[in-house]
């Protein structure tokens, strides 16, 4: 199990981006969150099996999301097992 935290910049607030991430994350069997940041970016935290996390990160990086993704910066960590669902914050 792994976790990644990604900062997604672009036109990602007010366009359904967080709902998209939550839905995709749940379909992949992940837990985590998608949170609006004050600078207009969205922070995505996802945890679960590495292949599923890589699939979600790939979706974020390819730009096939609501709005427009200009940049994705991700940091990988060991899973912390402190999350129970995928939430939109």
UniProtKB/Swiss-Prot annotation:
It comes from Frankia casuarinae (strain DSM 45818 / CECT 9043 / HFP020203 / CcI3). Residues 3-89 form the Acylphosphatase-like domain. It comes from the Bacteria. PANTHER family: ACYLPHOSPHATASE. Keywords: Hydrolase. One of its GO terms (molecular function) is acylphosphatase activity. PROSITE patterns: ACYLPHOSPHATASE_1 (PS00150), ACYLPHOSPHATASE_3 (PS51160). It catalyses: an acyl phosphate + H2O = a carboxylate + phosphate + H(+). Its EC number is 3.6.1.7. Gene3D superfamilies: 3.30.70.100. This is Acylphosphatase. It is an enzyme of class 3 (hydrolase). It holds the Pfam family Acylphosphatase. The active site is at residues 18, 36. Belongs to the acylphosphatase family.
